[in-house]
A protein has these predicted regions:
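Active-site-adjacent "gating/activation" loops or surface patches in catalytic cores
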Residues: 13-17, 58-60, 387
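Mature N-terminal segment immediately following signal peptide/propeptide cleavage
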Residues: 5-10, 365
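Electrostatic cytochrome c docking/interface patches
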Residues: 1, 29-41, 88-96, 108-127, ...
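Flexible, surface-exposed loop regions and adjacent strand-edge segments
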Residues: 66-68
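Electron-transfer interface patches adjacent to heme c in soluble/periplasmic c-type cytochromes
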Residues: 37, 41, 50, 54-55, ...
Length: 700
């Protein structure tokens, strides 16, 4: 491939022209991300069109490279200024600049998250949050679990069949921030005839779900609780790391995590006994859930339940869904299903042999299959490896524009990004003005996405292309990197990123503690170097307290043995640690131990690390367990310069980044910082306890 873009963009790889207009401007992040000679993607190796698309070999005028404007306003400006016109017969015109980041996917197919690609990471997260991968096959996303809750025991969870019907019909009427989309009353089915048929479908689906639901007996009883304390617990123990919760304080309300549902109006939705049981033992109701246990006491669980149950949607709870119209039910069964391979008369004869209940359940089953409910939810009767309901998106960014159905929507510009954007905003609009029978209508539901969400998701979809990148140009993972990515897939599945910033990515909940990050979930920076592998494995199996002074809790997850191994080995590989442990043999040099004690006293280590040493409240982790938990080499690096690992830590850098003298000055060990640090570390390891703290009971 030949790129001649620098014929016009003459200073694109040179620092100092950041404030110039195009085409004389310096490329963003020129020294770190792209173009610059010292960047990750030097222009002489990667060119321009590998990221931006277009025809880089054609530079005879402004239109030749297939420039694509960001929006209609820029298109008009270009028309006036450069005589721009829409590229014709060019399979891959330039990607609008707001979507460029999505092109990283072409070369970085195996990586879960990319540093310096915030918008791409956000788009990927949105596609996961809204469960697009469940209805549309996307190569590389097959490991993700179903995004919706299991409906196998749903009648033990929700208050009534009427609630199920009204929820299926209009989920946002109950929960405005729900990720459950709207299938009904859209552009192509809001006429009275379609609504009547859709109501018959909803009645039948709800009946099918209710009739096939297994009985579940809650293991706890709701006894009432303290609403104020429940609110405090939700804010402080870590629920906000996965859930948006109505009614919490502002600093927690701004945490925009969507791994779990938005918790609002539960008093109208759920059985109180079920809720307390779920809070105590999520895996008892759903053995495959990613919802962890916070090891709540009975009082804590009841207090949290009291707060959640206090939120109600009275109007929704009093709604009565229109009764099933059996005539319409039978009409749909005959015309849309039973006559598919039979004559109408034969279909009617088949219907006559079915009881009233059988007809309702048959339409329910058929409708669940029609709308693909099984893609997001486990539903009895839909077990097994069923095909996704929607078309595959693996190469959607390369799909010829002629294959996008614009229908009668002449106002939508004929580009990939404009069609995909419009489709995400109003997916049924393509049927408007097009004569279709009921069963052939578009079925893609409406998620009511914001413009910002749409832009981020389009960015990702445009990066899903059928490109032939040479192996030398692809990011090919070595054994360590592959192991790290496998671990991060597990971290993503259980939303570890919601609480923790992992190697610079994620950490929404920790941002709520910006005034004092020491009291939030810790950053997991160089975690595989920090902790010993055996300790980490045991900790994830049996969580025990490390920072006993914190309100926020590390929960107990329902990890499989394989998932724990992938996490532990992933972090170890990410930190390039080749051994499980570092052999700790404490051998003192003459006078070294006395010097270590002198430094320990001078620095007043126990003023923060109080546990086991003083009766003061601790402000830092219990050092008695450092020997079995931390690696020696990491401890040396941490003591020398803690802020290089955690910029927010209150731990002081006593050794001036490990290079200068000790402050306050203690003239021991020849004033050698490395010897002093090593001596302190050995002292900590020597008084370390041989065993870990007693783990919490697994499910209490």
């Amino acid at each position: 491939r030949i790129d001649r873009c620098t014929t016009c963009h003459v200073f694109i790889d040179k620092v100092g022209y950041e404030d110039q207009p195009n085409p004389y401007k310096t490329h963003p992040k020129v020294d770190t991300l792209a173009v610059g000679v010292d960047s990750a993607h030097p222009v002489k190796e990667f060119g321009c069109t590998s990221c931006h698309g277009g025809m880089g070999e054609r530079v005879n005028d402004f239109n030749a490279p297939a420039h694509t404007p960001q929006n209609q306003e820029q298109a008009k400006l270009w028309e006036e200024k450069y005589g721009w016109h829409e590229p014709h017969r060019i399979p891959s015109p330039m990607v609008p600049v707001q979507y460029t980041e999505g092109q990283c996917i072409k070369c970085h197919k195996e990586e879960e998250r990319l540093p310096m690609a915030e918008k791409l990471n956000e788009g990927r997260q949105l596609i996961e949050d809204y469960g697009c991968y469940a209805c549309h096959k996307i190569e590389g996303w097959e490991h993700l679990s179903k995004p919706g809750p299991a409906l196998t025991k749903v009648t033990s969870k929700v208050n009534s069949l009427e609630w199920i019907k009204n929820w299926i019909w209009a989920p946002h009427a109950f929960n405005p921030k729900s990720r459950m989309p709207h299938y009904f009353e859209q552009h192509n089915n809001s006429d009275e005839e379609s609504k009547a048929k859709n109501m018959a479908e909803v009645n039948s689906m709800a009946e099918y779900i209710a009739r096939t639901s297994k009985t579940y007996k809650p293991i706890e009883k709701y006894t009432g609780g303290n609403v104020a304390n429940g609110k405090k617990l939700i804010e402080n123990i870590g629920c906000i790391g996965c859930h948006q919760v109505e009614g919490v304080d502002e600093r927690f309300a701004k945490v925009n995590e969507k791994a779990g549902p938005h918790l609002i109006n539960l008093g109208t939705k759920v059985n109180p006994d079920w809720l307390v049981s779920w809070l105590k033992r999520p895996d008892h109701y759903d053995p495959t859930t990613i919802m962890p246990s916070f090891r709540l006491t009975d009082k804590e669980a009841n207090d949290i339940a009291a707060f959640l149950l206090a939120s109600k949607n009275k109007d929704f709870g009093e709604l009565t869904f229109p009764a099933l119209n059996k005539e319409i039910r039978d009409e749909i069964l005959v015309n849309d299903y039973l006559s598919a391979f039979e004559t109408i008369d034969a279909a009617r004869a088949k219907l006559e042999k079915m009881t009233d209940d059988e007809r309702t359940l048959e339409l329910g089953r058929r409708s669940i299959n029609k709308y693909g409910c099984y893609s997001c939810h486990d539903i009895p009767g839909f077990e097994g490896d069923l095909p996704p309901i929607g078309p595959e998106l693996t190469k959607e960014g390369s799909k010829p524009i002629e294959q996008f159905g614009f229908g009668q929507q002449k106002q939508v510009p004929h580009t990939r990004h404009d069609w995909i954007s419009q489709h995400l905003k109003t997916p049924r609009i393509w049927d408007v003005g097009v004569p279709k029978i009921f069963r052939d209508l578009y079925k893609m539901p409406n998620f009511y996405l914001s413009d910002k969400e749409v832009e981020s998701m389009v960015l990702v979809i445009l990066g899903l292309v059928d490109s032939k990148i040479p192996l030398a140009g692809q990011k090919r993972l070595d054994a360590n990197e592959k192991m790290y990515q496998e671990g991060m897939k597990v971290a993503n599945k259980f939303n570890c990123y919601g609480c923790h910033k992992i190697d610079g990515i994620g950490g929404s909940l920790s941002d709520a503690y910006e005034d004092n990050r020491d009291y939030g979930p810790p950053y997991l920076t160089d975690q595989g170097h920090r902790v010993q592998t055996a300790w980490f494995y045991d900790f994830l199996k049996n969580v025990h307290p490390i920072r006993t002074y914190l309100d926020v809790r590390m929960p107990t997850f329902n990890f499989s043995h394989e998932e724990i191994n992938k996490l532990v080995m992933g972090f170890q590989a990410g930190s390039k640690q080749l051994t499980f442990e570092e052999d700790v043999k404490i051998v003192w040099e003459p006078g070294e131990k006395e010097a270590a004690k002198q430094i320990w006293e001078e620095l007043a280590c126990t003023s923060c690390h109080a546990l086991g040493f003083t009766k003061e409240d601790p402000l830092a982790p219990d050092l008695r367990f450092a020997k079995g938990r931390l690696r020696s080499s990491w401890m040396d690096a941490w003591i020398a310069n803690p802020h290089s690992f955690l910029p927010y830590t209150s731990m002081a850098a006593f050794w001036d980044d490990g290079e200068g003298g000790l402050f306050p000055a203690v003239e021991v060990l020849d004033n050698d910082p490395k010897r002093q640090i090593k001596a302190v570390r050995k002292l900590i390891q020597e008084f370390g306890l041989p065993t870990q703290p007693k783990p919490f009971p697994k499910n209490n």
